[in-house]
Each structure stands twice: as C-alpha cells, then as structure tokens.
Amino acid sequence: MPLIGDLNRWLPVRPRVADDDALPLFCLPHAGGGASAFRSWQDGVPGTAVLPLQLPGRESRLRESPYQDMDSLVAVIATVVSTEAAGRPFALYGHSLGALVAFETVRALRRRGRPQPVHLFVSGCSAPSCPADDGPPVGGMAVPEVVQMLRRLGGTPEWLLADAGALETILPPFRADFSVKETYEYRAEPPLMVPITVLASTDDPRAPVEQQEMWLGETVGPVRQHTLAGGHFAVFEQGALTRSLLTEALAQWVG
C-alpha cells in the first residue's frame, strides 16, 4: 500500500465545524484543477463533510511533481480515502478526469477488499468504456494551442490565460493530468455494486450526453442521470443545483 505522508497535504480543505457524524464526500477535480474548485461547496451539502483532494503539482502542492499515469495516482488516492474514511460510510465525486480517477479508485478499493463508497458521482466525463476521442495529445501541443483548448472548454479565467507567468504555473499539472488521461487504458472488470449519479450537460465538447449514459454498464446498482444546461463546467456554474442533487442522492446516508 503506497505511503501518503501528511494526510493534510491531500485533504487541505476541512469543514469549519468538525462533525464526526458527517458523511465524508471526497471530491476529485478536473485536469489541472485543485482543491479550491470545491471550496464553495463547504457547508453546501447538508450532513456531509466535503473533502476536496489536492493532487501534487498545484496550489498548496505546487513544488511537488504531479502524477502522470492512472495506476500510480489511483493507488495513492485509494490509500488516502480508506485512511480518512477509517471504516465510516463515504461517497466519491469526480469531475472530468476526476470522474475517471474516482471510478478507478472505487475499483482499486474493491481489489484491496476495502469498503466501497455508498455513492459515486461523476460529471463531465464519458463512460470509461467509451473510446477516447480527445484530439491530439496535449503533451505535444504548443502553449497557444493549449490556451485555445482551455478557452474552448471554459472554466479558466481569461486573465490567467493571458498571463505568461501564470501559464508557467498552471500548464505543467495540466499537461501531467492529460498524460494520465491519454495513457489510461480501460480494463474490463465485473460491474460495481455502487449507486452512480451522472451529471451531464447539454453542450459539453469532451463528454457528449450519449456517452455519459453508458455509465449504466459500470454498476449493478441504480444509476440516475441529470442533464444540466451548459458546457463542460456546468456543474460548477450551477453549483446550487449540483449541490441539491448531491443532497438528494445522499439523503438516506445523512442525518
């Protein structure tokens, strides 16, 4: 089992009021994203402790080398999740690349014989069995091409895209995360026994609605899909609606 070091490096954003009865909701961000993507969700999902994961290479872990392959990343995240949950019920949420990482984390926990989450939430991500069609590898793109792609996806402030110094900070983890995605190989395993909620959006260039519907084949548990109006980051742009859907799905697990 991989060593994780200081757990606070991985989980830097804690609920302001500790509640031992709160359901841990581990959140994994999109490519290049950090824990701050979920900061506004604090106290927004009643009965849960929203715990965004901070991956190396960004924000408070800027000087650390980011992971570049799925297996290594998932191995350590599975350890972080099982250590923090400590046998309590928990849920997982992942957006875009984070959805794939969350899914593979659940499968890694199963292989270890560890408890499964009570619910898996995925957004902005085609089902893992879908053939990837993301265009040219990001690692080979020139900076202007990467900026153009980020601008097309949305979610990155324009001032940041126009700042050469800021780009030097955000592009390395972004490229590394895309290496995780581009080298990922889906391996068939028995379906999970975990309920899945899929949060799709009407105009997502990286995850068409019909490809998100195929998450149905990844579990024998119930699957529910909600489709939000908007693009790749609709779940954050409509945060109140997203949090209400999470609250509804977790109602039986929270007080």
Report each predicted region and the residues it spans.
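Domain-scale detector for complete catalytic domains at protein termini or as standalone homologs
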Residues: 1-93, 100-255
